[in-house]
Amino acid sequence: MSDYKSTLNLPETGFPMRGDLAKREPGMLARWTDDDLYGIIRAAKKGKKTFILHDGPPYANGSIHIGHSVNKILKDIIVKSKGLTGYDSPYVPGWDCHGLPIELKVEQQYGKPGEKFTAAEFRSKCREYAAEQIDGQRKDFIRLGVLGDWSRPYLTMDFKTEANIIRALGKIIGNGHLHKGAKPVHWCVDCRSALAEAEVEYYDKTSPSIDVAFHAVDKAAVLAKFGVADVNGPVSLVIWTTTPWTLPANRAISLSPEFDYALVQVDGQALILAKDLVESVMKRVGATDYTILAAVQGSELELMRFKHPFLDFDVPAILGDHVTLDAGTGAVHTAGGHGPDDYTISQKYGLEIANPVGPDGAYLPGTYPSLDGINVFKANDIIVEMLRDSGALLHVEKMQHSYPCCWRHKSPIIFRATPQWFVSMDQKGLRAQSLKEIKGVQWIPDWGQARIESMVANRPDWCISRQRTWGVPMSLFVHKETHELHPRTLELMEEVAKRVEVDGIQAWWDLDSRDILGDDADSYEKVPDTLDVWFDSGSTHSSVVDVRPEFAGHAADMYLEGSDQHRGWFMSSLMISTAMKGKAPYRQVLTHGFTVDGQGRKMSKSIGNTVSPQDVMNKLGADILRLWVASTDYTGEMAVSDEILKRAADSYRRIRNTARFLLANLNGFDPAKDMVKPEEMVVLDRWAVGCAQAAQEDILKAYESYDFHEVVQRLMRFCSIEMGSFYLDIIKDRQYTAKADSVARRSCQTALFHIVEALVRWMAPIMSFTADEIWGYLPGDREKYVFTGEWYKGLFGLADDEAMNDGFWDELLKVRGEVNKVIEQARADKKVGGSLEAAVTLYADADLAAKLNALGDELRFVLLTSGANVADYAQAPADAWQSDLLKGLKVVLSKAEGEKCPRCWHYTSDVGKVAEHAEICGRCVSNVAGNGEQRKFA
């Protein structure tokens, strides 16, 4: 028997079957770095329209976690896809470098500033620590395959950036948005500093829930309001609170002007509380025998005075819209120094804003003898006993509720009125302008708009001052007596900024005021406060985007972060940009959900359900992690586990195998001389290129709308269905057995070339390493990297008015699927081994029969059978298999006649008819020794 293997065009490629990504990717990264791939891309895109995705800076502390990976990969997918769309899309990564977490780490190692090191040395240690953390995180981000200007990132601790942050504050002051006030702010006693809204988390806490009686100063006057002459015992207004420690700061009781308040006789006293809450309060205090004597609207009780339950003064009843009937008594204990609503209503009535609590969370001397120096949370029980002893305590119980805590220490925080600097939301219309700007931004998902609108509408003034060591100084001078800002504040801030630009923030603390104030130095003092770190990152649209040359003065097109950043970076950036420039800093804002485990649980080291991106990259490779990110709908929670990553690896193998098949069958193909013109190609090949064209339209649309999971789904459908289970199966016969240089084979290779040229680009933003690897095996001259080009423009499809148009082949796909069902059943019944052992007769209605007959003898190649005949549907025998999908189709399968050709494996009756090639069929003889078979359709 002759060996005809050498006459076959067997697939061959150096592109490996196995990805071995964990081993292979680091080598690719080294090449990218050595070649300066990012620089090559920038040069290639120079002069094109820009798309700027501004990187929200991660905090320079600790190793990256899976959430960081999601964020950076999503950004990288967008930047790369924009590049392929024809944009110049520079990506400058950044880091947030100042603030408390770094201070705490340095304190753990070196002690607090002033103990072992001066404040200046402490800042230097903080700078060193941040730089070390950045180096570690940068290595991991690069390992993810994220392309960016990693050698020149922006750091909020860069001297120039620090200077520009000061300039941003100067602009806000110049626009009239800054004011100073002793307002209650979130205060962490462990940090000994104010906290931003975004630094507050909520945890369950058990607190005492108490009902307290404030006795009327003038019993008769209060009773007169109710039209009651006298009652048995004292008259008291009842408040309810879960923060007894705030009672020393009480200066009023707030009532609703609209609610009805009842006078209730119970147990030898008369109590005043909201009428709608009488039943629930009486039940809570254990009173069963009570009588409602009368009721009046809250407005009638305004300015009635009541005795403080343990301090030697009385307080007024005041009216406020913040009073609700959700819980309590309808009478709200009001301490202007310990709550924003309390502060607002106290200001309205001109009440004292008392703050008896020090920065350490202990009562200041002179508060009350048994409370001085006591921590406020420890004081709760003491105050409850004081109330019990005075007879003012009506009820006490323990209550579990959600309580604000410090994001860093996880400890309960307090509201505490301290002199702070605020960006005002309303004095110059910042709130109104911000709400207007929000409407001009595209929010992805769209629910983000309502979320941030609600936050802006309800947020208090922004406290931007902090009492910290490691931060950008506010760089202000205030008068020692009046505490007013220096009249030359803006000029002085620019002078400070110039010095900071040279020497960093230490220049402020080293500055002798006389150097820039002259004689005014005797009357003015430096403000010691630093800026909230959210001001640092929130001003990067000005301190970074506006000044980096690669952004060429363009505003950011997109901000992209986790959904917690509506109240964080998105908010601070919006506030600062609107206060500075009157406009939003971004055109689009995209948010992604948090990562959870396979059961939907929040990731936690204590549970042990975290997934380390480093482990994933070391075991599976970064492309698997990237594919998982892209294939997950980021608008909700993003589930990840070993099983989920395994599924991503399975999908990856399908895509890789498709690419390998395409490359292997381009063996010997030179696009410069072997390309077949579209009009001369086999129709099926043109259909396949058209499939790629249709897929590309869907994929590009999905990239444009940032629906990356749809990109992956469409890519998988193309590889698995249109290619894998149809086209690539059909072409094997022609590709392997036709003459090497025949139009039949070159047509097929032309299609494969167009398809892989498109496929590698679709993959590039997501599976960047694999796309780069494929790119290196593609035939023909090309740029060195796929990332410097654009989407493939060489695709074409069948015309709608052609007889064998897309609709024709869609019908053939269905027929092929139905015939496969019959073949699979025959194989299960041991009637045939493979499909080439079968011949089929298709009994079709007139319309379908016309389509099938149009293929002539090539129908069998589409069906992968050795024989295929078409007959009238009405002539089908009774035992013919009826298709459920195609009502006008019945199928009869029989064993193929003739002998098996050892070269093409088809069964035919002409095997051995040519003496010189006695073992093979006539078709193979033509392909081996003749002019080669002709294919028109398949």
UniProtKB/Swiss-Prot annotation:
Its EC number is 6.1.1.5. It comes from the Bacteria. Gene3D superfamilies: 1.10.730.20, HUPs, Valyl/Leucyl/Isoleucyl-tRNA synthetase, editing domain. One of its GO terms (cellular component) is cytosol. Binds 1 zinc ion per subunit. Pfam families: Anticodon_1 (PF08264), tRNA-synt_1 (PF00133), zf-FPG_IleRS (PF06827). A motif ('KMSKS' region) lies at residues 602-606. Its cofactor is Zn(2+). Zn(2+) binds at residues 901, 904, 921, 924. Catalyzes the attachment of isoleucine to tRNA(Ile). As IleRS can inadvertently accommodate and process structurally similar amino acids such as valine, to avoid such errors it has two additional distinct tRNA(Ile)-dependent editing activities. One activity is designated as 'pretransfer' editing and involves the hydrolysis of activated Val-AMP. The other activity is designated 'posttransfer' editing and involves deacylation of mischarged Val-tRNA(Ile). This is Isoleucine--tRNA ligase.
